[in-house]
Amino acid sequence: MMDPIHQFNIETIFTIGHIGGQEIAFTNSSAYMLVAVVLTSLLMLATGRKLVPGRMQSIAEISYEFVADTIHTTAGKDGMKFFPFVFTIFMLVTVSNLVGIVPYTFTISSHIIVTAALAFLVFFTVLIYGFYKNGLRFFKLFVPSGIPIVILPLVVAIEVISFLSRPVSHSVRLFANMLAGHITLKVFASFVTMLGAMGIVGVFGAVLPLALVVALTALELLVAFLQAYVFTILTCIYINDAIHPGH
């Protein structure tokens, strides 16, 4: 059976240079990040503004309205200033997840370093804007109202730990789901290949694994959208905390 982890290997395409003895390389991960950006840009540029929208325009409009509604629902009118930021994250995660389902491609969201970078970007955006807008009142985020004074220190400590752990949970959720799904697909696809190579008997035996591969691929499509949605709505919730701490 082929190694199911091999698909996640980061391989150097060409070396850009060295800084402090550290190689700076353009990798397959970098290439598929670029692919995700290009595909997203083409989707936005090729839509047009027809009165009767075509498929591409409909996809772009649905994506736009979905993100706008999500921000407005979770963060209110003030949250709309973050629309470009949230929309960019949503489209990047969605497109990269979908590209990764195509055989022999690379799933950038299956690497913790990528999801962690996005999660920390959200975390520091919330932190910086929270203090910029609210000053020291941002600390109200850690002091829930209506808590008895006796247990307040414990609650504050829990809230601080919860806040600091956000980048971890935010990144691991996306990374783990994409990693597990693609490993499962690879394992069953390998079964199909192995059984198919055994002749006519093996071909019949490969029917069930093949059916599972088709079903799992459909499930992965759902997971690709679902994880992009979860990552986006958590981003909006965290932004709401920066805008309205203590609410």
Curated annotation (Swiss-Prot):
Q: Keywords, A to Z?
A: ATP synthesis, Cell inner membrane, Cell membrane, CF(0), Hydrogen ion transport, Ion transport, Membrane, Transmembrane, Transmembrane helix, Transport
Q: Which InterPro entries match?
A: ATP_synth_F0_asu, ATP_synth_F0_asu_AS, ATP_synth_F0_asu_bact/mt, F0_ATP_A_sf
Topology relative to the membrane? Multi-pass membrane protein
Name one matching Pfam family: ATP-synt_A
Q: What molecular function does GO assign, one term?
A: proton-transporting ATP synthase activity, rotational mechanism
Q: Which CDD domains match?
A: ATP-synt_Fo_a_6
What's a single GO CC term here?
Answer: proton-transporting ATP synthase complex
Q: Where in the cell is it found?
A: Cell inner membrane
According to its UniProt entry, what is the function of this protein?
Key component of the proton channel; it plays a direct role in the translocation of protons across the membrane.
- Which proteins does it associate with, and in what oligomeric form? F-type ATPases have 2 components, CF(1) - the catalytic core - and CF(0) - the membrane proton channel. CF(1) has five subunits: alpha(3), beta(3), gamma(1), delta(1), epsilon(1). CF(0) has three main subunits: a(1), b(2) and c(9-12). The alpha and beta chains form an alternating ring which encloses part of the gamma chain. CF(1) is attached to CF(0) by a central stalk formed by the gamma and epsilon chains, while a peripheral stalk is formed by the delta and b chains.
Protein name, entry field: ATP synthase subunit a
